[in-house]
């Protein structure tokens, strides 16, 4: 039985409430969903339960499962990537991009001082950056299968 402190391997499919797959450890599922990344290794995810390596709701979901068990759980935003934080949205002068080797465009993801940010608005004078995680504020649905307890 899975408990805190136990190292396990799981296969998973992560979906938005709409049913759109945003992440998976299963290559065929990634291809079917149109999110396949050729340089990624699709294999069971290995982690120690309770060490905070994954989102809280995922770690809680695997507790008391057994090898071979599979279940689908809905994880509320507050136990996933958190609720959206308006303090993480910043307007900066468009002039700040003068030295950049690109033109800022809505929807573009950039690294601002090493932190990913999505450009949500571009005007003549300002660029709005959103530093919230792309899944912040979203309830997630995971199908999780316990593959192995690692000794």
Curated annotation (Swiss-Prot):
Q: Name one GO molecular function term.
A: peptidyl-prolyl cis-trans isomerase activity
Gene Ontology biological-process annotations: protein refolding
Task: Output the Pfam families linked to this UniProt entry.
Answer: FKBP_C
Q: Where is the PPIase FKBP-type domain?
A: 8-109
| PANTHER family named among the record's database cross-references | FKBP-TYPE PEPTIDYL-PROLYL CIS-TRANS ISOMERASE SLYD
Supply the domain comment. Contains an N-terminal PPIase domain and an IF (Insert in the Flap) domain. The IF domain, formed by an insert in the flap loop, is required for the chaperone-like activity but not for the PPIase activity.
State the protein's purpose: Catalyzes the cis-trans isomerization of peptidyl prolyl bonds and accelerates protein folding. Also exhibits chaperone-like activity. In vitro, can use oligopeptides such as N-succinyl-Ala-Leu-Pro-Phe-p-nitroanilide and N-succinyl-Ala-Ala-Pro-Phe-p-nitroanilide as substrates.
What this protein is called in its record is Short-type peptidyl-prolyl cis-trans isomerase
The organism named in the record is: Methanothermococcus thermolithotrophicus
């Amino acid at each position: 039985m899975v408990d805190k402190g136990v190292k396990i391997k799981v296969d998973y499919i992560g979906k938005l409430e709409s049913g759109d797959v945003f992440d998976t450890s299963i290559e065929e599922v990634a291809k079917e969903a149109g999110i396949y990344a050729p340089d990624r290794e699709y294999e069971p995810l290995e982690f120690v339960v309770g060490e905070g390596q994954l989102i809280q709701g995922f770690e809680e979901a695997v507790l008391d499962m057994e090898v071979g068990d599979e279940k689908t759980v809905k994880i509320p935003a507050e136990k996933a990537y958190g609720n959206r934080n308006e303090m993480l949205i910043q307007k900066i002068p468009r002039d700040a991009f003068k030295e950049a080797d690109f033109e800022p465009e809505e929807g573009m993801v950039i690294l601002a001082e090493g932190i990913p940010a999505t450009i949500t608005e571009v005007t003549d004078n300002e660029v709005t950056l959103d530093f919230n995680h792309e899944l912040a504020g979203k309830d997630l649905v995971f199908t999780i299968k316990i593959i192995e307890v690692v000794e």
